[in-house]
From Swiss-Prot:
It comes from the Eukaryota. Isoform 1 is detected in heart, brain, lung, liver, skeletal muscle, kidney and testis. Isoform 2 is detected in brain and in testis. Isoform 3 is detected in testis. Residues 1087-1147 form the v-SNARE coiled-coil homology domain. This is Syntaxin-binding protein 5. Part of a complex that contains STXBP5, STX4A and SNAP23. Interacts with STX1A and STX4A via its v-SNARE homology domain. Part of a complex that contains STX1, STXBP5, SNAP25 and SYT1. GO terms for biological process: exocytosis; Golgi to plasma membrane transport; positive regulation of exocytosis; protein transport; regulation of exocytosis; regulation of synaptic vesicle exocytosis; regulation of synaptic vesicle priming; synaptic vesicle cycle. CDD domains: R-SNARE_STXBP5 (cd15893). GO terms for molecular function: GTPase activator activity; myosin II binding; syntaxin binding; syntaxin-1 binding. One of its GO terms (cellular component) is cytoplasm.
Amino acid sequence: MRKFNIRKVLDGLTAGSSSASQQQQQQQHPPGNREPEIQETLQSEHFQLCKTVRHGFPYQPSALAFDPVQKILAVGTQTGALRLFGRPGVECYCQHDSGAAVIQLQFLINEGALVSALADDTLHLWNLRQKRPAVLHSLKFCRERVTFCHLPFQSKWLYVGTERGNIHIVNVESFTLSGYVIMWNKAIELSSKSHPGPVVHISDNPMDEGKLLIGFESGTVVLWDLKSKKADYRYTYDEAIHSVAWHHEGKQFICSHSDGTLTIWNVRSPTKPVQTITPHGKQLKDGKKPEPCKPILKVEFKTTRSGEPFIILSGGLSYDTVGRRPCLTVMHGKSTAVLEMDYSIVDFLTLCETPYPNDFQEPYAVVVLLEKDLVLIDLAQNGYPIFENPYPLSIHESPVTCCEYFADCPVDLIPALYSVGARQKRQGYSKKEWPINGGNWGLGAQSYPEIIITGHADGSIKFWDASAITLQVLYKLKTSKVFEKSRNKDDRQNTDIVDEDPYAIQIISWCPESRMLCIAGVSAHVIIYRFSKQEVVTEVIPMLEVRLLYEINDVETPEGEQPPPLSTPVGSSTSQPIPPQSHPSTSSSSSDGLRDNVPCLKVKNSPLKQSPGYQTELVIQLVWVGGEPPQQITSLALNSSYGLVVFGNSNGIAMVDYLQKAVLLNLSTIELYGSNDPYRREPRSPRKSRQPSGAGLCDITEGTVVPEDRCKSPTSGSSSPHNSDDEQKVNNFIEKVKTQSRKFSKMVASDLAKMSRKLSLPTDLKPDLDVKDNSFSRSRSSSVTSIDKESREAISALHFCETFTRKADSSPSPCLWVGTTVGTAFVITLNLPLGPEQRLLQPVIVSPSGTILRLKGAILRMAFLDAAGCLMPPAYEPWTEHNVPEEKDEKEKLKKRRPVSVSPSSSQEISENQYAVICSEKQAKVISLPTQNCAYKQNITETSFVLRGDIVALSNSVCLACFCANGHIMTFSLPSLRPLLDVYYLPLTNMRIARTFCFANSGQALYLVSPTEIQRLTYSQETCENLQEMLGELFTPVETPEAPNRGFFKGLFGGGAQSLDREELFGESSSGKASRSLAQHIPGPGGIEGVKGAASGVVGELARARLALDERGQKLSDLEERTAAMMSSADSFSKHAHEMMLKYKDKKWYQF
């Protein structure tokens, strides 16, 4: 990890290092207009990168273990990860360095340690007595493959079975091999000529620790006497063995086999099993053997004091149950319950009241580890209900497609979301509390609310409470509820852009203050939601359909530093002819049978009941145009104060007024340039005869007939001194819009009438999927020539703000900044009606300002700073309940609109300048406004490209945080763009990371590390220092339960459990040393890490000891004061007694 710690050295070179930038600024600005210096508080010492926590279901699980005393659950994965779970909120993630699959886990029960066996034949001992567990020892087997391990309760000797059939014994304290070895050829019959196969089971007799039960894969089971070093009994069965389990009395054991049978054996009757059971086999007539079933992969045999034992197994279904879901079978007495699971069963464990194997087990629950879920079954209630899982393991319920992270949210947000989400909880869970409740919570120093929003492939959105490094689901929204669902594939309209997951979420735009939510889906649809605590029934879902298509012909090389792009026709990535429609043409098709004016999804036309929470405000869909499918949306922004939403794709940009349900702007990217286009692209539509779209303007489709001055510039009639060339260009553009508006007013009305029918006819046309994710399909060259490799310029960033739109502006005004994939930034002015009543009656006037800025690479993020360098968030409308009672009229709703403008601040004078911060794939610029001079510039990367850039608040200041495709995380000060942090963290290995990585305020960040897990990290030095205290503790001192009472007669006649002195048997004195070539001992870093991890714990203990000492001192002081008071009282009493004695000393008794 590398930080700019040499910044202090470089500070001495500030004069020399800044001279070049000063010269550059002097070239950009006249000496009299030099930018004022802003005192920046963030330094490199404020930054440090470290992982915090990992949430979600362990990806590709492979092993399971449970400590019945500490109540801690461990899960191992195929990638070498280790996840530990305690009480809700206590989780831990560890990773084996080798990355080999975990094949088995064994707790040292109530010792705060865990042994993991990996597929690379390595054993590791983990220390769990520290907040970040670490490996204490490792043992690498060199000549044999490890297949099974067993660690008896309260024993330090670990039995290790191998693929060759041998058993080695490891001392878990020193992690060294004992010289005692059980060879396979000594365990089986001497007359047997075949190898018994790998060891699949090892366990000691619950009543006699000197007897070891060894199960071989071939079907042979051996009861080995450890003292005499010979086999007492051998049990043979024709079918392969998968698992073995003891009855607690040690007189019987049960085996599961590959033919779906269970065999129960008496220890002293090795000839044949006492009972053979086929749980799912069909009993045939004439006493014939049942038909074979699928293998029973695992069986457990648990006893109770008050009833029949439990036999619990996985697998064993009959072969004719094709397509049946995986099952867990619970056999209790004469009843058999088959519990179906949603995914394949990896492993399961029965949770029992006692850790002693020689006592009645009293099982109360079963933990079932599935391929993609963790299920806990209550054995004590009828019907075996499941426990409600408190862990955040449902992140992957549907694949995550996008993420957003919000730190320091309004304090009332989480309770509001929780209250509406609580009504969505399922019923029928067990009434008992979650039994895995070990560990203790950390002392969370962070108190600000954090919310994570995840978008999913099925169109659902989940809100998560991420405060204090925990994660809890708050609320789930299903966006697909507003659309009609096809009953089968034949009924599905062939207008989908994608064949699967047509409702998948691509972009989320959320305003925490107003609670307005806007999403963009993969089918080129946008849905706006408003938060409400009241249930409503929407009779007609408001919707708009937008035509957005623009094609170009030729591109000529512009004069200047930027080479031209190579362009291809827009609208379809192939030039193949479009097949004619096979169904009769209707109003939704153009004259030659091509699909036209048809959205990809069909909105429901029936009343929609909307529960409290997020409720649909407006549905916007892009439609097919002339046989061309709409391009997926690449950028989205919403502003609750203005009541506007804007979105763009590779064809252009559209702005919608969601209050008036009207389209305000519908332009191609080329039209934003006007006559300033450096690429001289000539618009052309090959279907002009069918689509009278004008000489360069896309159809401006709006929800209502809008006056022709809708796009008039608010300054076009003013006499303010603008640049004459810019003013002429703007005026020419406005006249062009006005002319086209008049010419096509009838055509717009006709198109709207067509759209209102919302017809969607099937077609054989299949969309091209090569541009499935436009936001990541860009070329990564080192200059603006990256557009050479793409066919169109897409909208990549959108930002609403109140700032200066032109150089000569004297005051800020509402506007929209638009960034494109070729590094161009446009400014669009917004003229909003004054007053809430006028806002709903008069149109919003939208017009390009003529301001164009350029950077290298696609623009990713834009933000604005005031003259003091403070972040200026967009204006917003505070949340109010929108669904007022019916008796209140419309004026009451109008009064509730209280837009809040936070930019510019009230303390800031109108004349003070602002700064626009623009981050692209290659560089960042800080533009001074209104002069539009480049105040600061930083080339972020030359050889790679920025995947995510965010302007975030940290330590009462602001900075730019970037994540590059080469794995570097960087931060820069604002506005000077000084490098503060540059750490190599994670290279871009898949698009999942690029799609989900995001920064948040207060030094937080996250990304989807696997399809099922979210990794959180921090780049704040303060958070890194406090992390140790924030993490939970896995180990807590707990008294080990007392061993079961042997009873008088059992102790007298030897009927109780027999103990074994394993130290004497396996120690070096009696068994010698093992061969050095057999296994290699590797000391782990756990000792050093334990010291580091315990440092803060020691400090805490010292503080608590000091506090206890102070309390003790106070108590001693109080005691001393009380003692002194008692002594004083005693002296006083003594004096009074002496005086009485002197007074009555000479008197006779009768004189009293």
